[in-house]
Swiss-Prot record:
<comment type="pathway">
    <text>Aminoacyl-tRNA biosynthesis; selenocysteinyl-tRNA(Sec) biosynthesis; L-seryl-tRNA(Sec) from L-serine and tRNA(Sec): step 1/1.</text>
</comment>
<keyword id="KW-0547">Nucleotide-binding</keyword>
<keyword id="KW-0648">Protein biosynthesis</keyword>
<dbReference type="InterPro" id="IPR010978">
    <property type="entry name" value="tRNA-bd_arm"/>
</dbReference>
<feature type="binding site">
    <location>
        <begin position="262"/>
        <end position="264"/>
    </location>
    <ligand>
        <name>ATP</name>
    </ligand>
</feature>
<dbReference type="GO" id="GO:0006434">
    <property type="term" value="P:seryl-tRNA aminoacylation"/>
</dbReference>
<keyword id="KW-0963">Cytoplasm</keyword>
<comment type="subunit">
    <text>Homodimer. The tRNA molecule binds across the dimer.</text>
</comment>
<keyword id="KW-0067">ATP-binding</keyword>
<dbReference type="InterPro" id="IPR002314">
    <property type="entry name" value="aa-tRNA-synt_IIb"/>
</dbReference>
<dbReference type="InterPro" id="IPR006195">
    <property type="entry name" value="aa-tRNA-synth_II"/>
</dbReference>
<keyword id="KW-0436">Ligase</keyword>
<dbReference type="InterPro" id="IPR045864">
    <property type="entry name" value="aa-tRNA-synth_II/BPL/LPL"/>
</dbReference>
<protein>
    <recommendedName>
        <fullName>Serine--tRNA ligase</fullName>
        <ecNumber>6.1.1.11</ecNumber>
    </recommendedName>
</protein>
<dbReference type="GO" id="GO:0140096">
    <property type="term" value="F:catalytic activity, acting on a protein"/>
</dbReference>
<dbReference type="InterPro" id="IPR042103">
    <property type="entry name" value="SerRS_1_N_sf"/>
</dbReference>
<keyword id="KW-0030">Aminoacyl-tRNA synthetase</keyword>
Amino acid sequence: MLDTKMLRANFQEIKAKLVHKGEDLTDFDKFEALDDRRRELIGKVEELKGKRNEVSQQVAVLKREKKDADHIIKEMREVGEEIKKLDEELRTVEAELDTILLSIPNIPHESVPVGETEDDNVEVRKWGEKPSFAYEPKPHWDIADELGILDFERAAKVTGSRFVFYKGLGARLERALYNFMLDLHVDEYNYTEVIPPYMVNRASMTGTGQLPKFEEDAFKIREEDYFLIPTAEVPITNMHRDEILSGDSLPINYAAFSACFRSEAGSAGRDTRGLIRQHQFNKVELVKFVKPEDSYEELEKLTNQAERVLQLLELPYRVMSMCTGDLGFTAAKKYDIEVWIPSQDTYREISSCSNFEAFQARRANIRFRREAKGKPEHVHTLNGSGLAVGRTVAAILENYQQEDGSVVIPKVLRPYMGNREVMKP
């Protein structure tokens, strides 16, 4: 959510920046008129309340003097009715304003490249050598089928499309990966490990920006106003909703492993096979609460920490700076880390690292004090995948595949897999 005072003072300038995000600004254009009406109503109500207090004092004087006060009492009642009517209109206007404010996307940071689609994203850096094959590299679902470690067919029978059973060494590889990721972030980067709830309430989904705009993309629990989490970012960020933190406690860094649930609305026909686009998948999420002046330095740290996972796994990747049109609703700046997928001859997203500035903190009312009696300020929040586990499994199977159908296990994972070096058919 954007700051109302900032919107009021810089309306046209902010609108020009939001145009680059390609968002529908129909509601945004209503803000000025509604905000003016709100301020006008507040002024009228305050004026009438002052008049009512004045009249009330006159009634008291007349009654003490045992004089007729009926005409003034009538006037006071009329003023009261007018206040009631204006208060009702004020509540309606404020509700409309709240709806508009919740629908306005975050403002892109000045360093974000201007563009309309993913084709306008800018490559920041590359790391690693792409593997070369003397044969046509197989897709990970075929490799997994030969190894007997993933079962999409039975998962479709049990649940539906875009689900999977991990079996045997597949399950162990998945577990090895998220344990390795958590150990790295907790031990090397001093994150606090958290296991969050997998269901959250409406206020939590609103706080991080999934609601109201993206409700159709969420899995909702029937008969309850609960949602399955699309990412651990939602419960972890909302841990500190409606709190005032001590400035000395910042930055706060959390690393959380969780299942994530996505409806993938709008993705029909895309990535219908394999692990790239599932309704349920595991992810290690990194969430930061920081002082505003530190947030862009922390974004670089966060991105480097997510990259470190791929470096230790020796998987080639690139880092992309998202353009304004591909930035999403909540981020002020975002990097996507994309891992090399040989069978597709392209890089695919495996992590997004975002700085939301105060956008989420304002929605979730998360503040801090620099000093014990200082004025509360909104924190800046950041989050990034460290990493999406299923996509990492896919990348390992494809980049480490051998012509005989076996897959070499990355060296860093071997202690987590009983010191095995290879998975064989």
